[in-house]
């Protein structure tokens, strides 16, 4: 996730909460990343010019994890807005393909976590903990 440093406005980002039963998938951002290094984050990335957010999400999951997800039919699960980026977070619980770390230049690990594991993680955004805990409780 690259953050805008010019006056072009906030970068538009899509991310996914991937669920597998009572586990959620997180990606560990490499320590050398300029923005949000060495933290656990949701998979996703930029919405390209003219691209629908749902299409962006499907593309990003293919690029980062090697999976094919259906476009979400529901509205975003959560949104984070800052002066530098606007992030839409979508719930994904069905996909095809074998999940791998296909973006090793961005993430040095991908892993599944249960609710009890989340509190000890350095997460990219403070709202992730309550959001993920609530999702896993349902």
Regions found by a protein language model. Give the residues of each.
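Short, charged/polar surface micro-motifs in flexible loops or helix N-caps
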Residues: 19-24, 31-33, 48, 83, ...
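Conserved Nudix-box catalytic region and its N-terminal flanking loop in Nudix hydrolases
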Residues: 23-63
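Short secondary-structure junctions
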Residues: 65-71
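Conserved N-terminal beta-strand and adjoining loop/helix that marks the start
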Residues: 2-25
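A generic structural signal for short hydrophobic patches within well-formed alpha-helices
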Residues: 47, 118-119
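Acidic pyrophosphate-coordinating catalytic loop
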Residues: 5-9, 32-35, 78-89
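Active-site-adjacent beta-strand/loop module that shapes the phosphate/pyrophosphate-binding cleft
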Residues: 69, 78-100, 109-111, 115-117, ...
């Amino acid at each position: 996730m690259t953050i805008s440093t010019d006056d072009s406005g906030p970068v538009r980002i899509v991310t996914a909460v991937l669920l597998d039963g009572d586990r959620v998938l997180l990606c560990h951002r490499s320590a050398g990343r300029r923005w949000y290094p060495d933290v656990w984050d949701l998979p996703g990335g930029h919405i390209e010019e003219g691209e629908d957010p749902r299409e962006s999400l499907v593309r990003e999951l293919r690029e980062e994890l090697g999976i094919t997800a259906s476009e979400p039919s529901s509205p975003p699960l959560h949104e984070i807005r800052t002066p530098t980026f606007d992030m839409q977070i979508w719930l994904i619980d069905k996909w095809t393909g074998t999940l791998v770390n296909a973006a090793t230049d961005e993430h040095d690990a991908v892993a599944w976590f249960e609710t009890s594991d989340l509190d000890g993680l350095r997460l990219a955004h403070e709202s992730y903990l309550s959001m993920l805990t609530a999702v896993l409780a349902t």
